[in-house]
Amino acid sequence: MPQQTQTQVETSTSSSSLSQTQTEQQSGPSPPQDQQVQGVLRLRPDSATDTKNKNKSKKKKPKVRWTEDVVDNEHMNKKKTKICCIFHPQRSFDDEMAEHNHEHDHGHCDSSDSDSSSDLSSDESEEENGNKLPSNGRGSDKDKLYKPNSYEYQPHYENKSRVQL
């Protein structure tokens, strides 16, 4: 009895796929069941699919590039944008004296007339400038400017990092 062998060949192109079936007739005795030849299926990716997968795996994440004037965090090669410690730059004695004199020469008087309309308008203008007054109810404290301590003050940094795509 002739044996029929069926072979299936698939051809794939980038726009469509083609399937072809071939049937062969063989005459002669068939090999026993344990000696039948088994085919090996080898799958190969389409060249267009292969390049897409390579591009996805090699896609670079954006990296931050620091400029030369960014300060190293405590000399440990860790340049960070977070606030980790408070830095007070050293000043010369002349600068400290000039600032000290400036703080006490604002023209404020120590009068107890804190309920007048002129004091109210000066308080509003000080709050607009970012200097908030303490609200503890004492009249003499209203004449002093409130300065936040180092932990309350948020510095205004200029973004010096560069993102490389």
Curated annotation (Swiss-Prot):
Cellular localisation: Nucleus
A UniProt-annotated Pfam family: PPI_Ypi1
Superkingdom classification of source: Eukaryota
Comp. bias (Basic and acidic residues): 43-53, 65-76, 96-111, 155-165
GO BP terms in the entry: glycogen metabolic process; intracellular monoatomic ion homeostasis; mitotic spindle assembly checkpoint signaling; regulation of protein localization to nucleus
Keywords assigned: Nucleus
Biased amino acid composition, Basic residues: 54-64
Subcellular location, principal: nucleus
A GO molecular-function descriptor: protein phosphatase 1 binding
Span list, region Disordered: 1-81, 96-165
Gene Ontology cellular-component terms listed: nucleus; protein phosphatase type 1 complex
Low complexity biased stretches: 1-40
Function description: Regulator of type 1 phosphatases which maintains protein phosphatase activity under strict control.
Similarity-based family: Belongs to the YPI1 family.
Protein name, as recorded: Type 1 phosphatases regulator YPI1
Organism the protein comes from: Lodderomyces elongisporus (strain ATCC 11503 / CBS 2605 / JCM 1781 / NBRC 1676 / NRRL YB-4239) (Yeast)
Source lineage: Eukaryota, Fungi, Dikarya, Ascomycota, Saccharomycotina
